[in-house]
């Protein structure tokens, strides 16, 4: 009867890891969308900067645009780093799930 407890705990751990892996996949997709959105904003600000002419109180407007562009570029960099971290964790969980599956298959064949 006690042999069922570790097996049940193994199943719970497997489910927990599988759910975490799926959550990471959703987060990765969300971060990729944010990267694309912010890259589009950077491009928009580049284009907007091209249209502003000196007669339009350029210094103040270009200063604001430069600041906004820098903020968006920083966000893109932050999202790229976050995405890499999430991908790494997802790969580690995939390896653990595969190892658990192989271990269970090995035990089933031995019986």
Swiss-Prot record:
Domain of life: Bacteria
Main location class: cytoplasm
Matching InterPro entries: DUF496, UPF0265
Location in the cell: Cytoplasm
Entry's Gene Ontology cellular component terms: cytosol
Residues forming coiled coils: 14-41
TM spans (from-to): none
Keywords associated with the record: Coiled coil, Cytoplasm
Function per UniProt: Pole-localizer protein involved in the regulation of several cellular processes.
Protein family: Belongs to the pole-localizer TmaR family.
Name of the protein described by the UniProt record: Pole-localizer protein TmaR
Organism: Escherichia fergusonii (strain ATCC 35469 / DSM 13698 / CCUG 18766 / IAM 14443 / JCM 21226 / LMG 7866 / NBRC 102419 / NCTC 12128 / CDC 0568-73)
């Amino acid at each position: 009867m006690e042999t069922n407890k570790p097996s049940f705990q193994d199943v719970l751990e497997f489910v927990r890891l599988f759910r975490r892996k799926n959550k990471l996949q959703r987060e990765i997709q969300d971060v990729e969308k944010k990267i694309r959105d912010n890259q589009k904003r950077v491009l928009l600000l580049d284009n907007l900067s091209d249209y502003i002419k000196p007669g339009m109180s350029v210094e103040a407007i270009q200063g604001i645009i430069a600041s906004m562009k820098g903020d968006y570029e920083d966000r893109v960099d932050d999202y790229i780093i976050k995405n890499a971290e999430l991908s790494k964790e997802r790969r580690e969980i995939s390896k653990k799930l595969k190892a658990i599956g192989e271990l269970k298959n090995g035990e089933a064949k031995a019986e």
